[in-house]
């Protein structure tokens, strides 16, 4: 018996296609019906939950909501679905274990289109270009062999930092900026910093200050309403274009100036080995450099410099704030260093495993003030289901790292700075409570410079504690002025400005510091002492 219509006919194929689509739609709607969205606060038409999220310290309101709705919350910002992850387990389950779906990046209009932070890996969608940049970073920043080559500049710059802090403790924050920038500029461009007023450090600092001043509200509105890009500067609300032009001009200089210096040095045969020369040489193996190749190398180099500088600075400033508030921690760490290292030399990275209490201090610095409290948002590529809840494709995914660092099940009395919380724990408990597993991000978007940053921070902290006393400043009546443990709201959480006094611990430490090369001592005016 023959069928009335052959399955190979156009009509049969059309009917079959329509039926398949109908079944797919039924399945999709059924799945949405059987898998509800994650819980979250009630939303309004059009606004969604935008009216409930403060511009200042949004991580804190998310943390409060998590007590009601759990570690995975669904919000809507205008038309955009947003997933807030307040749980380390959820962040690891989704971004670590389902990286193929959860590694995309949402549109960051202010950063990419107004400020021209491109092409840079942290703004790129997950794809081939992202993998190209990631490969460069992995080769230069994630292998032990590569990291070992940076030890010399880290050792030298920590010596410079000690001398500078003793000679000019009033401007300790500027010395921290110089220290951090000097390491990264040497690694990225082979550029030696000889002054606190180094042009590239000044340029980066000015650019970041201008970018932050543009405000998070503008960034949010542009991301959700990109048509606002087309309003004229003179129109109410169009001022972001003027501010953006200033940032863009500074960014253009950061992209071009150091790169051109490296390229010129290579042509003259005087180029130093650095990340930029590596990328240029690696790309040249595949043929002549195209304008796109040059732009990508510039973007990769500039991103490592500016992103690594800002987050490392805030971690070291948090360290100084914690130490001036907790002299008992300094004294305990000094006793450990004295016992293990002695007083005749400075600690080195080789000593790290033998100094467990110092490692606890640094863990607590990371936890007490995570540098990037909400991380950098990911985006879901396709629909997914987690714990029976539907996650719409295209959702923005925000990790509340600040709240994770205060999980009461892991960190007792979480607002307290207390390095001893890591003592007496099993290896599993230590791994679970180590804040470094969260502060550098998750999954395939994990910060590629985390090992370099962590070793630079550790070495600076170890040598500061070994040789210096960090004291409260005295007022006119000779009374100690205690700084407030407060942090500025923003994408990067900096301590609010504070003062301290820094002196050598004793004559032994003073003599050790005095042996350092005097040509590496800088005042805030940038002149050799």
From Swiss-Prot:
GO molecular function term, any single one: heme binding
Binding site for heme: 447
SUPFAM superfamilies: Cytochrome P450 (SSF48264)
UniProt-listed Enzyme Commission number(s): 1.-.-.-
Cofactor: heme
InterPro entries: Cyt_P450, Cyt_P450_E_grp-I, Cyt_P450_sf, Cytochrome_P450_fung
Enzyme class: oxidoreductase
Domain of life where this protein originates: Eukaryota
UniProt keyword list: Heme, Iron, Membrane, Metal-binding, Monooxygenase, Oxidoreductase, Transmembrane, Transmembrane helix
Chief location bin: membrane
UniProt subcellular location: Membrane
Bilayer topology term: Single-pass membrane protein
Positions of transmembrane segments: 9-29
Pfam families: p450
Pathway assignment: Secondary metabolite biosynthesis
GO cellular component, one term: membrane
The family this protein is said to belong to: Belongs to the cytochrome P450 family.
Function: Cytochrome P450 monooxygenase that is able to use delta(6)-protoilludene as a substrate to produce delta(6)-protoilludene-5-ol.
Name used for this protein in its record: Cytochrome P450 monooxygenase 136
Organism: Postia placenta (strain ATCC 44394 / Madison 698-R) (Brown rot fungus)
Gene: CYP136
